[in-house]
Swiss-Prot record:
The modification Phosphohistidine is found at H230. Pathway: Polyol metabolism; glycerol degradation via glycerol kinase pathway; sn-glycerol 3-phosphate from glycerol: step 1/1. Disulfide bonds: none annotated. The lineage of its organism: Bacteria, Bacillati, Bacillota, Bacilli, Bacillales. Keywords: ATP-binding, Glycerol metabolism, Kinase, Nucleotide-binding, Phosphoprotein, Transferase. CDD domains: FGGY_EcGK_like. Gene3D superfamilies: 3.30.420.40. ADP binds at T12, R16, T266, G309, G410, N414. It catalyses: glycerol + ATP = sn-glycerol 3-phosphate + ADP + H(+). This is Glycerol kinase. The gene is glpK.
């Protein structure tokens, strides 16, 4: 009896295996962290073999601890840290260099060169992205340019490229399936999101041979099966793939045009489903593919906030203001307001809609009466203000007024933050019962492909709310607070 769907959630710091049942509930999960490599300042790399090892370990742990047999798995869904690039040898299956992580800035010079050559507009039109070190394309070029013999091997068709999803499907299938899905392909800087294919002009710009690239498939279909020696003698369908943020949008059942979710992790990622049309952004958002399903493609607008949960970690570890992140809520609630204090946590620059990598963090409005409580509250409020910046851009680009924001991620446990978020947006905020929406989204995509779930309506019915936060703040007050934030942003940008 095929009782479960196994979701593999390959993140930036750890890999997880999560078993879901028919009700979309978590049966069991296992997690394993892996090593972060920082060869030079600003560079971030992972060992792709270690990632693969961590995936095998969490699968084994999860199944054995849950006492679930491999033959009880109906299908496998994969969700992954996006943009991270792996290049490996087709014959040996060994990576020729570490995986270059999405956060890594080692290709900034390549990006500057491409911008100087005037490619920005073409890239924007075809991919919906900006020329930035964040995306995979320049990482692949860097590997081909910097690893001895790599370019020659690539030209001879001896190397393969993949984002993490591609690498894992290739390994699980014993090298039989070299695929990615629309959502991951749309983050590479090499994929035309309108024609839905790898783009020759973009590949020429990056000097990446087409033979390296995976086949691009829907986010929900059977790509292949696990090879028996990697899955305890069983051939289980690998049937769903989506990048982490798109998987979360699916896991939140944001299937309708204009529905949006915000994930509060290390940073924040807000995605709005724009239906079957790609909306070009005039306000610093990315246009991306949400998923491909049943022969149709859904698009999304995406806003990225670089510092969210990491600002709370900074209060805990850097400033030692509390021992546990959950205490931030207690401190913030002890004061009525920040008394005019604003904190702009631009520790690594500002993301959407500013896209300023030079700017650094700042604080404003500090007086002799400012206390630890004010400081903590101002830091939490900064997450909500940054989210409003993104939402304003989304509403302006899409012409859609948001009526509810669904939220997930670590920081959503903080009731103070969620209530303030609702107040400052003047929109209800809904927190789901199952916060593991990324893994759930991948499970749903796989389950639909193997007939474990019938359709999206069945999935929609499984979405249950834990708590709804309603806005109660006077409009005048929230407008005044937000105007102060905008002033703080302008002042921060001026100080370089």
């Amino acid at each position: 009896m095929k009782k479960y769907i196994l979701s593999l959630d390959q993140g930036t710091t750890s890999s997880r295996a999560i078993l879901f049942n028919k009700e979309g509930k978590i049966v069991h999960s296992a997690q394993k962290e892996f090593t972060q490599h920082f060869p030079k300042p600003g560079w971030v790399e992972h060992n792709a073999q270690e990632i693969w090892g961590s995936i095998l370990a969490v699968i084994a742990t999860c199944l054995s601890e849950a006492d679930v047999k491999p033959e009880q798995i109906a299908g496998i869904g994969i969700t992954n840290q996006r943009e991270t690039a792996v290049v490996w040898d087709k014959t040996t299956g060994k990576p020729i260099y570490n995986a270059i992580v999405w956060q890594s800035r080692q290709t900034v010079e390549i990006c500057d060169e491409l911008k100087e050559k005037g490619y920005s507009e073409m890239v924007r039109e075809k991919t919906g992205l900006l020329i930035d070190a964040y995306f995979s394309g320049t990482k692949v070029k860097w590997i081909l340019d910097n690893v001895e013999g790599a370019r020659e091997k690539a030209e001879n068709g001896e190397l393969l490229f993949g984002t993490i999803d591609t690498w894992l499907v290739w390994k699980l299938s014993g090298g039989k399936a070299h695929i990615t899905d629309y959502s991951n392909a749309s983050r590479t800087l090499m994929f035309n999101i309108h024609d839905l294919q790898w783009d020759d002009e973009l590949l020429d710009m990056l000097t990446v041979p087409k033979s390296m690239l995976p086949e691009v498939r829907q986010s929900s279909e059977i790509y292949g099966e696990t090879i028996d020696y990697h899955f305890f003698g069983q051939n289980v369908p690998i049937a769903g793939v989506a990048g982490d943020q798109q998987a979360a949008l699916f896991g939140q059942a944001c299937f309708g045009e204009g529905m949006a979710k915000n994930t509060y992790g290390t940073g924040c990622f807000m995605l709005m489903n724009t239906g079957e049309k790609a909306v070009a952004s005039e306000h610093g958002l990315l246009t991306t593919i949400a998923w491909g399903l049943d022969g149709k493609v859904n698009y999304a607008l995406e806003g990225s906030i670089f510092v969210a949960g990491s600002a709370i970690q900074w209060l805990r570890d850097g400033l030692r203001m509390f021992k546990d992140a959950s205490e931030s809520e207690v401190y913030a609630s002890r004061v009525e307001s920040t008394e005019g204090v604003y904190i702009v946590p631009a520790f690594v620059g500002l993301g959407t809609p500013y896209w300023d990598s030079e700017v650094r963090g700042a604080m404003f409005g500090v007086t002799r009466g400012t206390t630890k409580e004010h400081f903590i509250r101002a830091t939490l409020e900064s997450l909500a203000y940054q989210t409003k910046d993104v939402l304003c851009a989304m509403e302006a680009d899409s012409g859609i007024e948001l009526n509810t924001l669904r939220v997930d991620g670590g920081a959503v446990k903080n009731n103070f933050l969620m209530k303030f978020q609702s107040d400052i947006l003047d929109v209800p905020v809904e927190r789901p019962v199952i916060n593991e929406t990324t893994a759930l989204g991948a499970a749903y995509l796989a389950g639909l492909a193997v007939g474990y779930w019938k359709n999206q309506d069945e999935i929609k019915a499984q979405w249950h709310m834990d708590k709804r936060f309603e806005p109660t703040m006077e409009a005048e007050t929230s407008e005044e607070l937000y105007a102060g934030w905008k002033k703080a942003i302008e002042a921060t940008k001026a100080f370089k």
